[in-house]
Amino acid sequence: MVLIRVLANLLILQLSYAQKSSELVIGGDECNINEHRLLAIVYTNSSQCAGTLINQEWVLTAAHCDGENMDIYLGVHNESVQYDDEEGRVAAEKFFCLSSRNYTKWDKDIMLIRLNIPVRNSTHIAPLSLPSSPPSVGSVCRVMGWGTITSPNETYPDVPHCANINLFDYEVCLAAYPEFGLPATSRTLCAGIQQGGKDTCGSDSGGSLICNGQFQGIVSWGDNPCAQPHKPALYTKVLDDTEWIQSIIAGNTAVTCPP
């Protein structure tokens, strides 16, 4: 069963659909307080996701994280401790690859959010640039999030967790999920640990996959339970949409994603 990795508000829901709702990192450790300055928490009436700050006014996340009354928080490390530079914002505008807001298991699970007020760079807040080159298969990549650290029973931590996973050829994910009829080629990245034990999971959706220091992927979907052997997760490929993202930020809001 595949999971869209999102945490439902009030009730923690495990969605048995082919998208990772926002999940916490399985098999990871508490992130160093200085390594997740880019990490946003994205709340709506019905879900919790993650996002990535790409400049002082814009956050990139997954399309399936969309919802009403969106709040975005940056600079948070411990939910029990408030830091002086924590920032809370609302979504002033949201942009999707398709005007219908459609997305699939393998394409266009991406949403660009303009914050109502820009944030300031600080000790705990800093953007991560868009990628300039594609990642290499075999790369060790970093994932981070506030999602559940256990699966299928869910345990949500007070601090974000980080883990290292491997980038695979897309064919590995193609073979792992024959029941979903994935296309022969895809604009997603396939990443995980073949023996299992490390994975993104519930409430990590929309977070970043960072390979060799570059923001290469957005947490999209994966298996349920999470972190199973031979069941890597799929991540929206950021590089394919950089021109669209940059055009939106520049004010060309009529631009469309590449086909």
Swiss-Prot record:
Enzyme superclass (EC): hydrolase
Entry-linked Gene3D superfamilies: Trypsin-like serine proteases
UniProt domain Peptidase S1: residue ranges: 25-250
Lineage: superkingdom: Eukaryota
Keyword Disulfide bond: yes
Keywords per UniProt: Blood coagulation cascade activating toxin, Disulfide bond, Glycoprotein, Hemostasis impairing toxin, Hydrolase, Protease, Secreted, Serine protease, Signal, Toxin
GO biological process: proteolysis
Glycan-bearing residues: 102
InterPro entries given in the database record: Peptidase_S1_PA (IPR009003), Peptidase_S1_PA_chymotrypsin (IPR043504), Peptidase_S1A (IPR001314), Trypsin_dom (IPR001254), TRYPSIN_HIS (IPR018114)
Subunit annotation: Monomer.
Protein name (record): Thrombin-like enzyme gyroxin B1.7
Propeptide: 19-259
Family under the similarity heading: Belongs to the peptidase S1 family. Snake venom subfamily.
Stretch forming the signal peptide: 1-18
Predominant location category: secreted
